Regions:
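Acidic, glycine-enriched active-site microenvironments
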Residues: 1-168
Length: 168
C-alpha cells in the first residue's frame, strides 16, 4: 500500500468511509478503521445525515459532511483515508479536509464497469485514475476493507430504518 498510494511508510491506521440510504431516507455515513492488527471495531463510527442542508440522496454532499464531522478538531489521524466512491466523492472529501485544516493522503475506490469486483478504479489527487492487476494481493485487501465499510454502512442503515419503522 505504501507504494500504491505514495505513502512515506506502511500505513498503521486506515480509515474507510461509505454512505448508505434508500432514496435519501435514513441517510447514514459509516467509517471503519483497520491496521496491522485487523479491523478495529471499537473505533468504527456512524454519522447520521439528517442535515436539512443536504439534499436527500446527494452522496457527494453526504461524504463531504461526514469527512467534515470526522476531522473537525480531530486528535487521532489516519495514515490514509479511503473513500468508497469515485472522483466526485474524492473531491468533496479533499474540500472537507481543507476546510478542517487537515492534510492527509486520500484515495477513492470505485467499482469498475458493470460494478465488477476486480475492475476497481482508484482516484488520487494529481494522478490519473488507475487500476491494480486482478491478482494483486493489495487489490484483495482494499476490496475487503471497502466491503467492510459497505457492510457496516448497510447494517447501520437497516438498523436505523427498522427503529424508525417501529416508532411509526
Amino acid at each position: 500500500l505504501r507504494e500504491i498510494f505514495s505513502l512515506p511508510s506502511p500505513p498503521q491506521r486506515i480509515e474507510v468511509f461509505d454512505n448508505s440510504h434508500i432514496s435519501g431516507t435514513h441517510a447514514l455515513g459509516a467509517m471503519i478503521v483497520t491496521g496491522p492488527e485487523g479491523f478495529q471495531k471499537n473505533a468504527y463510527r456512524k454519522f447520521n445525515m439528517d442535515d436539512a442542508a443536504i439534499t436527500p440522496g446527494d452522496d457527494i454532499a453526504m461524504m463531504k459532511a461526514m469527512i467534515t464531522r470526522r476531522f473537525r478538531g480531530a486528535e487521532t489521524l489516519p495514515d490514509i483515508v479511503l473513500i468508497d466512491g469515485g472522483e466526485p466523492q474524492l473531491n468533496a472529501s479533499l474540500a472537507a479536509l481543507k476546510e478542517a485544516g487537515v492534510t492527509l493522503p486520500v484515495a477513492a475506490i470505485a467499482k469498475g464497469p458493470e460494478r465488477n469486483a476486480g475492475r476497481e478504479r482508484f482516484f488520487m489527487p494529481g494522478k490519473p485514475p488507475f487500476s491494480l492487476a486482478p491478482d494483486d494481493p493489495a487489490l484483495y485487501f482494499l476490496q475487503r476493507i471497502r466491503d467492510e465499510a459497505h457492510r457496516f454502512a448497510i447494517t447501520s442503515h437497516r438498523s436505523r430504518r427498522s427503529r424508525a419503522l417501529a416508532v411509526s
